[in-house]
From Swiss-Prot:
Zn(2+) binds at residues 390, 497, 500, 521. Belongs to the arenaviridae nucleocapsid protein family. This is Nucleoprotein. It is found in: Virion; Host cytoplasm. Gene3D superfamilies: Arenaviral nucleoprotein, C-terminal domain, Arenavirus nucleocapsid protein, head domain.
Length: 560
């Protein structure tokens, strides 16, 4: 029986490529145009917030609204998208046997995907016997992998939302978005990202790239460090840097490779594509495996094709499509709906100006006078003491804080710190007010005691600024202790800082440790450390003492 055979997954992929090659188009230029527009126009503070909520173990309606709003903005910026075009296939489009075959496969696919989404996240079973599955589980335990456990009934509800249908079509990765995020959040040039992903795409023409391949390619393409080594769970992939998202992006950059990812569906060719897919299915003995697990190549193709009758089924934006494949493609009815318009927009950029004026100095002095030297004052920095890029001074009793930034001199060292620690992107410091950080340090109350987590860097910073009068109290929390309230602080106070939009990549020597993926923000770290000492989040509302128009310089409308 065909269903008892091991699925030759890559052979199926190659067969589908050969059969459907006539329906592919060069996509590199369009993907890069969309990627550039997303990189220039999207608010990456919102991207960081969505990436943060996707890391939560449980997400609700508010989280889903944020994801959907961001997906809507991405869809607006993209020219490569799928549009709602519910398709009805009838005799004449396909033969009667083909229509029955298609209807049967869509029904099986509906059952498979429905079963997977109603149960806990699972691994792809393939066609393993029970004894093989048990042996695999033992191997994974030996290697240190933890099995995901559900509640009493074995159900893990990653999304606890009032209307589950709103989850539909919100999670597929898109090459243009992947490239834009790797460029902006990784602090890379788009050319470097494209070259790295092209290497992955070329490898994908002969095999499925795996983590070993990724590690070797990373030696040549440093920007691939951003790709996560973790296995993606169900319904979190949209903005995650998974290997599968990177491979898909690479495939879209390989013009002339007959990649399935570059198929374009139109109302005129839809039935022909489905007919060709059914032909190769019969020839190769492909089938819908109804057991829960990841989709095999045929299942993946069928689902994507039948979701929308027009657009780019693999690589386009489809977040605005309503319904599922079995809702949007049907058999023996007689209707063809209309398609919607598409209209990307363009944006401009800006420049920055001068140093502190007398009026600005007066504003900073007035702000610093509001700090009570007799009460606890926290301070934290990001970047080395010889080249700091962020400084925060926070007084828990009043909630008053001063938060400022500085453009680094050592851009190479900064990039390393961004990738492994603070996640600040150089472009977000272009307009930081020069001289402000040092001026704030000079105005700290004479002889005051500053509370810190790790005193060495702050002491060196004070020495450089001639502030030997200031005393330090180091709370000396362990790394794990200091991060106890990390998720809650980012959830409640993350809106206070919009500068940490990069992706954090754990250092190689820390890979085995449970290292955080949240960026280190000087201000939020101060709040976090005080929360550990208090055992709860602050009761006071944080108040920024400096206006944002002083922390960052005014931007010119255009360049002469």
């Amino acid at each position: 029986m065909a269903h008892s055979k091991e699925i030759p997954s890559f052979r199926w992929t190659q067969s589908l490529r050969r059969e459907l090659g006539m329906f592919t188009e060069p996509t590199k230029s369009s993907v890069l145009n969309d990627a550039k527009l997303i990189a220039d126009s999207l608010d990456f503070t919102q991207v960081s917030q969505v990436q943060r909520l996707l890391r939560k173990s449980k997400r609700g309606d508010t989280d889903l609204d944020k994801l959907r709003d961001l997906n809507k903005e991405v869809d607006r910026l993209m020219s490569m998208k799928s549009v709602q075009n519910n398709t009805v296939l009838k005799v004449g489009d396909l033969g009667k046997d083909e229509l029955m075959d298609l209807a049967s496969d869509l029904e099986k696919l509906k059952k498979k995907i429905g079963d997977r989404e109603s149960n806990s996240p699972r691994m792809y079973m393939g066609n393993l016997t029970q004894s093989q599955l048990e042996k695999r589980a033992g191997i994974l335990r030996t290697l240190g992998f933890q099995q995901q456990r559900g509640a009493a009934g074995g159900v893990v509800r990653l999304w606890d939302v009032s209307d589950p249908s709103k989850l539909n079509n919100q999670f597929g990765s898109m090459p243009a978005l992947t490239i834009a995020c790797m460029t902006v959040q990784g602090g890379e040039t788009m050319n470097n990202v494209v070259q790295a992903l092209t290497s992955l795409g070329l490898l994908y023409t002969v095999k499925y790239p795996n983590l070993d391949d990724l590690e070797k390619l990373t030696l040549e393409h440093d920007c691939l460090q951003i790709i996560t080594k973790d296995e993606s769970a169900l319904n979190i992939s949209g903005y995650n840097f998974s290997l599968s998202a990177a491979v898909k992006a690479g495939a879209s950059l390989i013009d002339g490779g007959n990649m399935l990812e570059t198929i374009k569906v139109t109302p005129n060719n839809f039935s022909s594509i489905v007919k060709a897919a059914l032909n190769v299915k019969r020839r190769e003995g492909m089938f819908i495996d109804e057991r829960p697990g990841n989709r095999n190549p045929y299942e993946n193709l069928l689902y994507k094709l039948c979701l929308s009758g027009e657009g780019w089924p693999y690589i386009g934006s489809r977040s605005q499509i309503l319904g599922r494949s079995w809702d949007n493609t049907s058999v023996d009815l007689n209707a063809r709906p209309v398609t919607g318009p598409r209209a990307p927009e363009k944006n401009g950029q800006n420049i920055r100006l001068s140093n502190l004026s007398e009026m600005q100095e007066a504003i900073v002095k007035e702000a610093m006078r509001k700090l009570d030297s007799s009460d606890t004052i926290w301070m934290d920095i990001e970047g080395p003491p010889t080249d700091p890029v962020e400084l925060a001074v926070f007084q828990p009793s009043s909630g008053n804080y001063v938060h400022c930034f500085r453009k680094p001199h050592d851009e190479k060292g900064f990039k390393n710190g961004s990738r492994h620690s603070h996640g600040i992107l150089l472009k977000d410091l272009e307009d930081a007010q020069p001289g402000l950080l040092s001026y704030v340090i000079g105005l700290l109350p004479q002889g005051s005691v500053i509370t810190v987590q790790g005193a060495d860097d702050i002491k060196k910073l004070f020495d450089i600024h001639g502030r030997k009068d200031l005393k330090l109290v180091d709370v000396r929390l362990t790394g794990e202790q200091s991060r106890i309230f990390e998720q809650e602080v980012w959830e409640k106070f993350g809106h206070l800082c919009r500068a940490h939009n990069g992706v954090i990549v754990p250092k190689k020597k820390n890979k085995e440790a449970n290292s955080t993926k949240e960026p280190h923000c000087a201000l939020l770290d101060c709040i976090m450390f005080q929360s550990v000492l208090d055992g709860h989040l602050p009761d006071t509302i944080p108040i920024q003492l400096l206006p944002n128009t002083l922390v960052f310089q005014a931007k010119s409308a255009f360049v002469m």
